[in-house]
Curated annotation (Swiss-Prot):
Its main location: membrane. Transmembrane segments: none annotated. GO terms for molecular function: oxidoreductase activity, acting on NAD(P)H, quinone or similar compound as acceptor; quinone binding. Belongs to the complex I NdhO subunit family. InterPro entries: NdhO. It comes from Synechococcus sp. (strain JA-3-3Ab) (Cyanobacteria bacterium Yellowstone A-Prime). This is NAD(P)H-quinone oxidoreductase subunit O. It is a peripheral membrane protein. It is found in: Cellular thylakoid membrane.
Amino acid sequence: MAIKRGTLVRAIREKLQGSLEAQASDPLIPNYVFETPGEVVDIKDDYLQIKFGAVPTPPIWLRADQVEEIAS
């Protein structure tokens, strides 16, 4: 199923760690990125802007293949 705005997702640790996106930021990715659901708020090409609502942080951009949809 295609991911669209409003979809709940979780980052895949193995695909995010060591990626170009991770290297462009702090090398220690916070656990909430992998342990809490995030909501897709925008989509541009292969990238998703994800807002993690459990913590007061700005949204982050991740490639679509670095996340998995959470079954509702």
